Structure formats: C-alpha cells, structure tokens
Amino acid sequence: RDEVAVRNCPRVYPVKPIENLVRARQTLLAEPGPSPWRLVVLGGGPAGTEIAANLWRLCAEAGIPRDITLVAGERLLAGAPPRVRALALESLRSRNIHVLEATRARRIEPGEIVLETGRILDYDLAFSAVGVRPSPLFEESGLPTGPDGGLLVDSTLRCTAHREIFGGGDCISLRGTTLARVGVMAV
C-alpha cells in the first residue's frame, strides 16, 4: 500500500485510531460548514468503503449537504469476490458517492488532494484509510513481530515468545503466512 505525502493538513483524518473519526464527526456536526461539504475518502479497501458509507449516513441523518468522493486506488475492494465488489459499487453509487478507480492520491495539501492522474480534488474534510498496519506497540514493547510489525503468533494465535499472550485480527503476523489487512483492529 502506498503512503501519501501529507503537508500540515489538520482537516485530514487518518481512520486510526478511532478517536480521529470521533473528532471528525464532531467537526462535521458542530460547524455550519460549506454547502455542500466536500468529503474525500482515500483508500478503496473495506475501511475506506465503510467510512464513505458511514459519512453518507451521518450527513443524511443530520441533514448536511455533502459531496462524497472515494479514491479507491486500482479498484474498489480489490481483494473481494467480484459479486461483493459489484454490490458495494452499486450501493455507493446509488447514494451519489463518487468512486474513483485506477488512481491514488499523490499529495495532500490543505484543501486539495492531487491525484496520480493530475486531477485535483478540493476537500473540506478528508479521511485516510490507506496502508493499514499494526500498531507499533508490539515492537516498542520488545515482543516478537513479523515483517509488517504485527505480533508474531503461531497457529493457535499465541505469541511465539510469551505463551500467555494471544493476538488476533489486523494486529498479528501469523508465522509462515501472509495475512490480508482488512481494516479491523483487534487485540
């Protein structure tokens, strides 16, 4: 997954930790804001797809005019079965959420996102759901980690060095296997 250069952008919220989304929600609901709010979600995996849909629901329930764009990378839910992908695209598009495929953000600056294609997306709030990675907690605490920084566990989800510690979800590295990161953080 690609990292995006972000330049001092207080209106860009990484989706993790969850507190970032709470702050973004408070901003969206507290301020009169533009009409419509221009909301951009970066990342076409499960987390980005869920964020885009939840933004739509939040704004719809609060009566907030919105223009939501999801920058999906190569394609929305690339690792999902074709039927799941088609249903997700249909659901998002039926809510007038713009899904941009075959492009990524190259650079993010205050108020604008420059895509690889050269297109510029203006935004009022943006959400980054790219590059799902385990927390650095495991490396910082001296626990064994896999190549991606996840807690190294065996087939029973026990830490390889401390049998009393178990891990699961996107925070682990299963010894001998590469796991897809799907945006769920469980410890």
Functional labels for PLM-detected ranges:
Residues 10-35, 120-187:
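FAD-site-proximal beta/loop scaffold in flavoenzymes
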Residues 22, 49, 78-79, 162:
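Loop/helix-junction capping segments adjacent to catalytic residues or to phosphate/diphosphate-binding pockets
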Residues 24-65, 71:
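Rossmann-like NAD(P)H-binding beta-loop-alpha module
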Residues 57-155:
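A Rossmann-like FAD-binding core segment of flavoenzymes
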